Amino acid sequence: MKTILLTGAYGQLGVVCEEYLNKHFKVYSTARTAKNKRFLLDISSRQSVKRVLENVQPDIILNLAAMTDVDRCESEPGIAKKYNLNGLINLCDGFDGHIIQISTDYVFDGKKGPYDENDSTNPISVYGRTKLLAEEFLINSNHNYTIIRTNVLYGFTDNAKASFLQWVINSLKDSKSIRIVKDQWNNPTSTNSLAKFILNIASTSTYGLYHYADEGLMNRYEFAQLIGKVFHLDRSLIQPILTSELNQIASRPMLSGLKTRKIEEELGIKPPLVETCLLEFRKMLKS
């Protein structure tokens, strides 16, 4: 049985990946704060990474550890680079196995989305630039790598910060009005859906750059409306606004989203509809 070192195991994607991968691999789950039998690992520390790699000797590294707060990245670019680029470099130092790196649609400028793997990158935020630098490091290295770009991840977990899905559901259940942007377009992606794809990549030793996102390009307001519809909540509480009204520090790609033709043609994998994934979450909550 192959061994996987999983970083960022405490995040919303990490929790789900841990569950899926444990059935097929020997998984060593790590996080910056050691909880629930996970091992302590700060990927920004070269010594810490070296010690863990020597002890675990993994065949595969699944790197989910990152600084993903887009506005904080903009305010603290040094820290963003420390985790989003230098952390990956530390993981690769002396490692000769398969590294799986999660990336983002924020490597694009959001002017002409949705994008495929051959489209030119042009990040407009520190977060996007640091994630692109990480991609470029892997592509120019001699490592066996898989880069998976995704967007607008959502799911359910008790162990991580509430996702967009949980926030919308909880707000509407509490009869709270919420303001959602109507001018940012993506195809929202279920953590369950992405975790299954990652399992496939790890199991088949598939290398390269791939886009993975669920099927259904929509703006955030439409996504919130769809959540309200699927979970039978009061959608009149959802108010559409423009991104400019939020006065956010970092710029966001407006017309983004990811095309998945490459994985469909090369790997025979077709992502599910966004609504299908939401219905699965509703069923899961009822059980």
In which residue ranges do the predicted regions lie?
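NAD(P)-cofactor binding segment of oxidoreductase domains
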Residues: 75-100, 135
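Rossmann-fold cofactor-recognition segment
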Residues: 32-47
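Conserved C-terminal active-site "lid" loop/helix of NAD(P)H-dependent oxidoreductases
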Residues: 219-225, 242-286
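NAD(P)H-binding glycine-rich loop region in Rossmannoid oxidoreductase-like domains
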Residues: 43-83
